[in-house]
């Protein structure tokens, strides 16, 4: 599968991110005995889109939760490991990544109803922003710029479609740390950028021009930290409660897309993820 040279040229010229192939991307579940209770944490998805002609050496190790990448390409690729389906739990990663030209290291995924392609970019070498700047979110020791960009008649997990991209771009790039995914989902929702049902979610490397290499290990945890969201325009700053503040009581809500209340629980309860829109103290 691949993107034609005409489409790839249009994507690069338009400043848009490279996309997966038009047909739905297949996923790889190596351990069919993974229970539903463990699927949120166990890596079960290998994203391995490499356009025809792209010079990419990608070596995933799902059991170890790591992958290596080496590329020198003018063709598009998106590769990485993660989860199907994705969720709002934090992702911790570590390793190395460097690029000359375009090189993106990001939490990457899709939702349906609405169809959305999303990124939390930790490294964004050579990437030119496009679309509308919607504000910033401060979380995980850094500040991210929030962008929304519309893709018209472009490849997606549902075939050729028109859809929006939600993009958080870290101002101070890093190659190790924790991405509190819930904080980005909340910040996007506050900016009117709502996700639907989550599809796959990976820690990915992407490029369509240049060279680079890296090795990344990743895992998924529970809970989350504090965040500050600053929308653009004449609106006020909204700050979610700190994890050190008063927590929600037993059976109270403690997370979810658009949730602005407590994100921790009073002792001895913990915040348990139920779905993208609701987490509960149990």
UniProtKB/Swiss-Prot annotation:
Pathway membership of this protein? Glycan degradation; xylan degradation
Ranges of compositional bias, category Low complexity: 227-243
Domain of life where this protein originates: Eukaryota
For this entry, list what GO says about its biological process.
xylan catabolic process
GO MF annotations in UniProt: cellulose binding; endo-1,4-beta-xylanase activity
What is the activity-regulation note? Significantly inhibited by the wheat xylanase inhibiting protein I (XIP-I) and the proteinaceous endoxylanase Triticum aestivum xylanase inhibitors I (TAXI-I), but not TAXI-II.
- Domain GH11: where? 40-219
Regarding pH, the record states: Optimum pH is 3.7-4.7 for birchwood xylan.
Matching PROSITE patterns:
CBM1_1, CBM1_2, GH11_1, GH11_3
Q: Note the InterPro entries from the entry.
A: CBD_sf, Cellulose-bd_dom_fun, ConA-like_dom_sf, GH11/12, GH11_AS_1, GH11_dom, Glyco_hydro_11
Annotated segments matching region Disordered: 214-245
The reply to whether Signal figures as a keyword in the UniProt entry is yes
Q: Name one Pfam family in it.
A: Glyco_hydro_11
Q: Which reaction does it catalyse?
A: Endohydrolysis of (1->4)-beta-D-xylosidic linkages in xylans
Q: What class of enzyme is it?
A: hydrolase
Q: What is its EC number?
A: 3.2.1.8
> The CBM1 domain covers which part of the protein?
246-282
Provide one Gene Ontology cellular component.
extracellular region
- Positions of disulphide bridges: none
- Report the subcellular localization: Secreted
Which PANTHER family would you find in this protein's record? Answer: ENDO-1,4-BETA-XYLANASE, ENDO-1,4-BETA-XYLANASE A-RELATED
Q: What family does the Swiss-Prot or TrEMBL record give for this protein?
A: Belongs to the glycosyl hydrolase 11 (cellulase G) family.
Q: What is this protein called?
A: Endo-1,4-beta-xylanase B
């Amino acid at each position: 599968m691949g993107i034609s040279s005409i489409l790839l040229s249009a994507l690069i010229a338009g400043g848009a991110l490279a996309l997966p192939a038009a047909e739905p991307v297949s996923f790889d579940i190596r351990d069919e005995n993974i229970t539903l209770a463990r699927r949120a944490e166990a890596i079960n998805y290998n994203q391995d889109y490499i356009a025809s002609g792209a010079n990419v050496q990608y070596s995933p190790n799902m059991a170890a939760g790591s992958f290596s990448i080496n590329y020198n390409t003018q063709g598009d690729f998106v590769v990485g490991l993660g989860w199907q389906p994705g969720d709002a739990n934090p992702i911790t990663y570590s390793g190395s990544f460097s690029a000359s030209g375009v090189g993106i290291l990001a939490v990457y995924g899709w939702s349906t109803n609405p169809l959305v392609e999303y990124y939390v970019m930790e490294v964004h070498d050579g990437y030119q922003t496009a679309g509308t700047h919607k504000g910033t979110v401060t979380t995980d020791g850094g500040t991210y710029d929030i962008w929304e960009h519309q893709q018209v008649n472009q490849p997606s997990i549902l075939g050729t479609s028109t859809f929006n991209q939600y993009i958080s771009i870290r101002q101070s790039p890093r190659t190790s740390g924790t991405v509190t995914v819930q904080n980005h989902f909340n910040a996007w929702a506050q900016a009117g950028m709502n996700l639907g049902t989550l599809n796959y979610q990976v820690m990915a490397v992407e490029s369509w021009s240049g060279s680079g290499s890296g090795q990344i290990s990743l895992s998924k945890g529970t809970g989350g930290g504090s965040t500050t969201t600053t929308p653009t325009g004449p609106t006020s700053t909204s700050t979610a409660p700190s994890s050190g503040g008063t927590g929600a009581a037993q059976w109270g809500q403690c997370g979810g897309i658009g949730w602005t209340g407590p994100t921790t629980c009073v002792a001895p309860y913990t915040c348990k993820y139920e779905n993208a829109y609701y987490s509960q103290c149990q």
